A protein has these predicted regions:
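Glycine-centered short loops/turns at secondary-structure junctions
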Residues: 72-73, 150
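Short, flexible coil/turn micro-motifs enriched in small/turn-prone residues
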Residues: 8, 74-76, 131
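N-terminal helical cap/lid subdomain that shapes the substrate entry/recognition surface
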Residues: 1-60
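Asp-based, Mg2+/Mn2+-dependent phosphohydrolase catalytic module
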Residues: 39, 63, 67, 78-184
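A short, structure-level motif marking secondary-structure boundaries and short turns
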Residues: 9-12, 49-51, 71, 102-104, ...
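Residue-level marker of alpha-helix boundaries and capping positions
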Residues: 16, 56, 77, 133-134
Length: 184
C-alpha cells in the first residue's frame, strides 16, 4: 500500500524521482512508527534495487508475442523505471535483443504521462504518433500519455474491467495483441 502511494505521488508530480529514491523506505518505516537513518535507508535502497534488477518474471506469452512482432515491427521500451534496472532486467530475461531502444526517466528526465517522454521516444525511433502503438499496463502513465500525443494505445490489464477510454483497446492476455495486429 505504501509503495503504491509513493509511486502515485511521483506520477502526480507531488514528489521528485530523487525524493522517491531517498525517502521510499523511510516513508514505509514511518508508517509503522519507526524512524530510519539516511545511511540505513541508502543501504536498504541499494539492496532493493539490486534485488529488483534480478527479478525477471515474464508474463505468459511474452516470447511468443515478441517473436511475432520483431519481423514486422520496430520495438522500443518506454519506462518510468531506472535505466540501469531496466537494462539489467532485459539482459537477464533474454529480452535485450528484441528492442531497439530503451527510453527511461533517467535518459530524458521526464516521466510518463508527460508528452515529452513520448516525443523523445518517437524522435529516437524516427517515427510519428500515427505510426506508433503504445502497449502498457497503466491507464494514467501509459494510455493517457500515448493518447495525448496522438498514438494508438493498448491497455494490458488481465484483471481489470473494460477500459473507460474508448480510443484504447483493452487486452487481458498478450496473445490478444497478436490477434489484433494480424487481423484475426
Amino acid at each position: 500500500v505504501h509503495n503504491r502511494e509513493i509511486w502515485r505521488r511521483l506520477e502526480a508530480k507531488e514528489i521528485t524521482h530523487d525524493y522517491l529514491r531517498e525517502e521510499r523506505f523511510k516513508y514505509i518505516m514511518r508508517a509503522i512508527g519507526v524512524e530510519m537513518s539516511n545511511e540505513l535507508s541508502d543501504a536498504v535502497n541499494t539492496q532493493f534495487l539490486d534485488t529488483l534488477s534480478n527479478y525477471t518474471h515474464l508474463i505468459d506469452g511474452t516470447i511468443e508475442l515478441l517473436d511475432f512482432l520483431v519481423p514486422n515491427y520496430e520495438l522500443h521500451i518506454l519506462s518510468n523505471g531506472l535505466d540501469l534496472i531496466q537494462r539489467k532486467k532485459m539482459q537477464l530475461s533474454g529480452l535485450g535483443n528484441y528492442f531497439k531502444n530503451v527510453v527511461t526517466f533517467d535518459t530524458v528526465q521526464v516521466r510518463k504521462p508527460d508528452r515529452e517522454i513520448f516525443e523523445a521516444a518517437m524522435n529516437l525511433a524516427n517515427t510519428t504518433p500515427e505510426n506508433s502503438l503504445m502497449v502498457g499496463d497503466s491507464i494514467d502513465a501509459d494510455i493517457k500519455g500515448a493518447l495525448e500525443v496522438g498514438m494508438q494505445a493498448v491497455w494490458y490489464a488481465p484483471n481489470a474491467e473494460i477500459s473507460s477510454y474508448a480510443e484504447a483497446h483493452h487486452i487481458r492476455h498478450l496473445s490478444e495483441l497478436k490477434s489484433m495486429l494480424s487481423g484475426e
